[in-house]
């Protein structure tokens, strides 16, 4: 078992070194928040980029840029200061199952939040304790908070899942990785300081799940919260303080299809 862990560790470290470079950014949805410098712009652009992240990455990036254009490329200012008439431009916006109703609710929730809060981080951390092992309660709180406004549309709930419903929460875990992790390559932002890297849970992308099974990090095939925790624990055996950094390695190799 120790030999297997050692071999897997060497493979993951090698893959991480290969893919953890600024060139990773260009063709990934994380390129969307990288267009901005203001913290709140990064948060809003990052949230939409993460939520839109299923399917072809080029399409995801194009749709994100379309949305940013409708927000005059100033998402924080738009969210904060828009008027009802400004929302008409979104009536034809759609990305797969994410439709106008969903978008308008997102904008409404974000406007409500930023009226009272400096950062979107608090929407997660208000549900957490500093000694929590992971972000499970933060994600559950974010879900409840996101749909606490009157007349919140039921259909939008599928875009903000929660661990309590056994969702792997892939997109939100990816968003948290972007906001929390800080390291030298400049891929992730590290602008949130009240959630620690060791509390993050690995985003369970289809490529990540496949490669994790090939490397025998996990054996299960089902993509749910339990599996996400199992994979994260396996990665903690390799790097207990920053396990989710290996998401970049697993995803990068899975997408590239190249040999180790």
Q: Which residues does each predicted region cover?
A:
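HhH-family (HhH-GPD) DNA N-glycosylase catalytic core used in base-excision repair
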Residues: 1-260
């Amino acid at each position: 078992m120790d030999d297997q862990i050692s071999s897997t560790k060497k493979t993951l470290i090698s893959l991480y070194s290969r893919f953890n470079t600024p060139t990773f950014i260009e063709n990934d949805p994380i390129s969307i928040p990288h267009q901005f410098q203001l913290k709140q712009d990064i948060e809003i652009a990052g949230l939409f980029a993460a939520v839109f992240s299923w399917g072809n990455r080029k399409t995801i990036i194009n749709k994100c840029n379309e949305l940013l254009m409708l927000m005059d490329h100033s998402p924080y200012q738009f969210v904060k200061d828009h008027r009802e008439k400004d929302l008409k431009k979104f009536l034809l916006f759609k990305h797969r199952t994410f439709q106008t109703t969903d978008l308008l609710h997102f904008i409404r929730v974000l406007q409500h939040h930023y009226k009272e809060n400096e950062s979107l981080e608090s929407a997660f951390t208000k549900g957490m304790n500093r000694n929590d092992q992971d972000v499970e309660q933060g994600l559950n709180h974010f879900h409840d908070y996101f749909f606490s406004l009157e007349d919140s549309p039921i259909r939008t709930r599928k875009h903000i899942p929660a661990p309590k419903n056994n969702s792997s929460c892939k997109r939100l875990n990816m968003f948290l990785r972007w906001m929390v992790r800080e390291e030298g390559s400049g891929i992730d932002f590290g602008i949130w300081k009240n959630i620690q890297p060791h509390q993050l849970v690995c985003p369970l992308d289809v490529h990540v799940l496949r490669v994790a099974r090939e490397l025998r990090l996990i054996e299960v095939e089902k993509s749910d919260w339990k599996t996400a925790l199992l994979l994260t624990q396996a990665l903690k055996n390799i790097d207990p303080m920053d396990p989710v950094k290996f998401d970049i390695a697993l995803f990068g190799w899975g997408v590239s299809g190249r040999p180790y």
